[in-house]
């Protein structure tokens, strides 16, 4: 019976994707009943960008399609509806079997025993954690220093965000307000409680805001597993996104965890055409209303109350 499903979305990641899968396999083989689900996100939008740039098509999908025939722990999936690693992850979860889910990018190296030890701990303590567990990160693969996230807010502008900060060591896992979804472990039940990532999310922005701050209003926690970091390879992938996509994704996240007013404040304070911005807002309020209603029915606090409990200032009434 599969215990752990490892979800790895990819778009223009070759050959780092192969090294990523290999490092995960080396970590788990013979130690955990696991599966690795790679999700190739080649789609018309990405194809058009790659043709325009003159870059070569990613070889990852062909490689993993062939490889899965000899490795029962590997599933090579394809998601081509739109360019979005959030939707690629949603699709992979729907095809997975594990009670526990671990998400990572296709450009990481897993340090020996880090993932195994984290999974061993999480399997024993997930009930008391009541939330997610994350490995610290190094942004560039050869860096020694470790990073986590810190909370960055300005509710007058609809900003509920994050940035990198220095990791602090500890003897056991500790709570933080937010953390990267690269290296994130959760139960399938928590994924279901979140409703998965909102189906309207595109390629960039919003996905981590959604996870962290929807967990917050649901009364769940975000936790760091101290020790070895997940070594991340920060680099360009040969594709891009535009500002409207980013605003839309952040607006989706704000709306789902914070409601109409928070989404509107965020849009009010963006630069650009007001007509375009408010068209984005209207579309988000229409297409994401079911997900917002789902979270609103189950939340135990508001994002404003949660921020106040962290000791951060709220805007004047």
Residue spans of the language-model regions?
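The conserved acidic donor/metal-binding loop of glycosyltransferases
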Residues: 105-109
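Short, acidic, metal-binding catalytic loop of nucleotide-sugar glycosyltransferases
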Residues: 22-33
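A conserved acidic beta->alpha catalytic loop
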Residues: 38-63
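Conserved donor NDP-sugar-binding/catalytic core segment of glycosyltransferases
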Residues: 113-156
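Terminal low-complexity segments of carbohydrate-biosynthetic enzymes
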Residues: 181, 242-317
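A recurrent flexible, glycine/aromatic-enriched loop bordering the glycosyltransferase active site
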Residues: 86, 166-185
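Short aromatic/hydrophobic "clamp" motif used to bind/position activated sugar donors
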Residues: 101
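Glycine-rich, basic loop-to-helix element that forms the pyrophosphate-binding segment
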Residues: 79-96
């Amino acid at each position: 019976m599969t215990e752990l499903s490892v979800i790895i979305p990819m778009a223009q990641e070759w050959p780092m994707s192969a090294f990523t899968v290999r490092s995960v396999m080396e970590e788990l083989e013979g130690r955990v009943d696991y599966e690795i689900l790679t999700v190739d996100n080649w789609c018309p939008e990405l194809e058009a960008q790659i043709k325009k740039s003159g870059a070569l098509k990613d070889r990852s999908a062909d490689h993993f399609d062939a490889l899965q025939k000899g490795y029962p722990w590997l599933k090579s999936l394809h998601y081509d509806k739109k360019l979005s690693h959030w939707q690629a992850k949603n699709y992979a979860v729907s095809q997975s079997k594990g009670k526990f889910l671990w998400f990572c990018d296709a450009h990481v190296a897993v340090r020996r025993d880090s993932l195994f030890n984290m999974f061993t701990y999480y399997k024993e303590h997930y009930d008391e954690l009541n939330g997610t567990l994350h490995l610290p990160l190094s942004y560039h693969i050869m860096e020694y220093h470790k990073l986590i996230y810190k909370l960055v807010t300005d509710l007058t502008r609809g900003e509920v965000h994050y940035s990198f900060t220095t990791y602090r060591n500890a003897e056991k896992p500790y709570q933080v307000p937010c953390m990267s979804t690269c290296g994130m472990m959760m139960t399938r039940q928590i994924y279901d409680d979140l409703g998965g990532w909102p189906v309207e999310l595109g390629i960039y922005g919003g996905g981590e805001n959604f996870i962290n701050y929807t967990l917050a209003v649901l009364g769940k926690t975000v936790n760091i597993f101290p020790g070895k970091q997940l070594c991340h390879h920060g680099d360009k992938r040969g594709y891009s996104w535009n500002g409207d996509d980013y605003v839309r994704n952040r607006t989706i996240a704000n709306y789902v965890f914070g409601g109409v007013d928070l989404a509107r404040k965020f849009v009010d304070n963006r630069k650009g055409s007001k007509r375009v911005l408010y068209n984005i807002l209207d579309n988000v309020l229409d297409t994401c209303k079911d997900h917002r209603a789902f979270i609103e029915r189950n939340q135990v606090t508001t994002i404003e109350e949660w921020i106040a409990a962290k000791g951060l200032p709220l805007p004047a009434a």
